[in-house]
């Protein structure tokens, strides 16, 4: 059995954080959808790009509430210069009039939910995990080879990251994923995390993860292994039997 565990050090910095965990199997990453379903997913993404505008009340990206909240969170631990929460990159596309486009069914569904609810979402190939998955504070220098890089980029001491027994999986909380655990066309078992640092939005977080699970089941055949919200009172959960 594999577990997802949020370490004590994380809660000392973010006692009010909540992380929606969705573990799924039998995902058909390379599924070829019929025209009707492909159109439905495109419509979901188009609608999400439009609805995301409600989170953008300022032309200056850093002045918008969602982005400001995450930048404040990132100021509480060491980060690589320029590292930003993943939702900021999506919202920046919308702000600049270059909406997030279609890539692949699961990516499009995930991006649609991320934009609709303004929560960062990350997905990893769970079959590549070595032992349990953790979210916690790094000692610095742990193994990490980012997607698209030709050299390792280890985390800083004190940085928050997802990690397992072999090394870091995602740096700076939800900023950059590693090559080792990347979701590809052959991936069938996935760990998905959706993060919330605003206590008044926990209800929206539950709604978002429920909708994501339903969409992945409907369009790409995903079967839910576990779906749970992690918080300071429930710090771990099973993700693979």
Where are these regions (language model features)?
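Charge-biased, low-complexity intrinsically disordered regions
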Residues: 1-241
């Amino acid at each position: 059995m594999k577990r997802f565990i949020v370490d004590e050090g994380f809660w000392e910095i973010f006692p009010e954080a909540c992380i929606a965990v969705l573990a799924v199997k039998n995902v058909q990453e390379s599924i070829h959808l019929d025209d009707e379903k492909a159109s439905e997913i495109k419509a979901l993404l188009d609608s999400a790009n439009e609805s995301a505008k409600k989170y953008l009340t300022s032309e200056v990206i850093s002045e918008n509430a969602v982005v400001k909240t995450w930048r404040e969170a990132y100021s509480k631990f060491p980060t690589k210069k320029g590292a930003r929460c993943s939702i900021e990159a999506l919202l920046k596309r919308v702000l600049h009039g270059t909406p997030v486009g279609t890539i692949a069914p699961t990516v499009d569904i995930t991006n649609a939910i991320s934009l609709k609810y303004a929560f960062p979402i990350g997905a990893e190939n769970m079959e590549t995990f070595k032992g349990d998955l953790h979210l916690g504070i790094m000692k610095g220098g742990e193994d990490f080879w980012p997607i698209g890089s030709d050299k390792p980029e280890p985390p800083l001491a004190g940085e928050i990251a997802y990690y397992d027994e072999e090394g870091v999986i995602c740096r700076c909380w939800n900023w950059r994923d590693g090559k080792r655990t990347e979701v590809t066309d052959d991936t069938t078992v996935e760990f998905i995390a959706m993060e919330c640092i605003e206590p008044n939005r926990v209800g929206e977080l539950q709604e978002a993860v429920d909708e994501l699970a339903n969409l992945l089941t409907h369009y790409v055949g995903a079967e839910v292994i576990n779906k749970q919200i992690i918080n300071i009172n429930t710090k771990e959960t099973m993700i693979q039997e």
